[in-house]
Amino acid sequence: MSKFRFAIVTGAVALLLMGCSATSSPEESLQDVMEETVTKEKPYAEAQKPLQELEKKEQNLYETIMGLGMKEMDKIQELSDEALKNVDKRKEYIQKEQTSMDEAKETFADASKYIEKLDNADLKKQAQSLEKTMKARYELHGKLTKSYLNVLDGDKELYEMLKKEDLTMEQLEKQVTSINKEYEKVSKLNEEYNDKTNEYNEAKKDLYSNEAFEEKKD
């Protein structure tokens, strides 16, 4: 019943292939970790468009069903079954997305040991702030995913209810109200998550442009 857009982390415009060898500086190793994190999040990024398309289709199905009368119960049941399949597909994408983010989070965890090895105090402080932002981002994504799955559970229950001929208006309104409340949570978390992602991207850009960071990579 609503559509959300999720921000993604951006990679470096130009990246030297360094590979974290024994001779790599902490700065080089840190950049490798950050760019590998982008790679790990790629499946998550790729899931966004099809997920949004499914959300749009579900919205259309919902509006069509709500426009039908009880005399068209066969059509309501047919469309509800289609909507239930839509819910299952969205759940699959969310699960793939979460797997991608879990792997990215695990990869990014390596950043900490390289940040601790940075010699420049100001650079280290900047990198620690970036790390804190990314950790907060992953925490928000976990909350967002949990809330979105609650929405899908609510949607599934709704379309199962709509297939019943003895469904009352009171039951329908109660379920729709419950789903809308969860959507409000998703919307709020989505906004916070996108803000945190943009904050991380800016922090990463600033870190890469820091002269102390560039010097140690040369």
Kindly label every feature range from the protein language model.
Residues 22-95, 99:
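Immediate post-signal-peptide N-terminus of mature secreted/exported proteins
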Residues 188-218:
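Extracytoplasmic/luminal low-complexity segments enriched in Pro/Gly and acidic/polar residues
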Residues 58, 62-65, 76, 115, ...:
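Extended amphipathic alpha-helical segments
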Residues 16-19:
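C-terminal motif of bacterial Sec signal peptides marking the signal peptidase cleavage site
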Residues 25-28, 32-35, 71-74, 78-81, ...:
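Primarily heptad-repeat coiled-coil rod domains in cytosolic scaffolding/tethering proteins
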Residues 1-8:
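Bacterial N-terminal signal peptides that target proteins for export
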Residues 97-179, 186, 206-214:
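Extended amphipathic alpha-helical interaction segments
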